[in-house]
């Protein structure tokens, strides 16, 4: 039971950070989502030094400074925009820096299976 409370405090701390930073909004599409659908995206020019899973937000006094510093370097995206951004990056584009690319990827229809 103690580990359940400990784990949920990590989710609570993460949600507090997301609410304070973006109001639970995706920084790409601008839609509001529950915390389970928001993810931290490390831009290509930022060196990823740690994972920002819920467990890294645990702690009796909240997350440590290393976790906060890592989160501050990231972009907060919904799960859909996060996947689209990685597809775009593989193709040499970025949804975050090119609104026309965002529209193109969001409106893309799969024609082959």
Protein language model regions, located:
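Short cysteine-rich loop/turn motifs with clustered Cys
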Residues: 13-44, 72-80
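DEDD superfamily 3′-5′ metal-dependent exonuclease/proofreading module
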Residues: 22, 68, 109-113
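BZIP DNA-binding basic region
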Residues: 1-6, 44
């Amino acid at each position: 039971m103690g580990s359940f409370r400990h784990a949920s405090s990590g989710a609570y701390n993460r949600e507090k950070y997301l609410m304070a930073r973006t109001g639970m909004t995706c920084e790409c599409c601008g839609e509001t989502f529950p915390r389970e659908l928001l993810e931290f995206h490390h831009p290509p020019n930022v060196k990823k030094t740690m994972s920002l899973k819920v467990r890294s937000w645990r702690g009796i006094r909240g997350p440590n400074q290393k976790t906060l510093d890592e989160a501050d370097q990231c972009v907060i995206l919904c799960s859909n925009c996060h996947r689209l951004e990685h597809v775009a990056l593989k193709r040499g584009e970025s949804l975050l820096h090119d609104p026309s690319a965002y529209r193109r990827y969001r409106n893309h229809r799969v024609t082959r299976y």
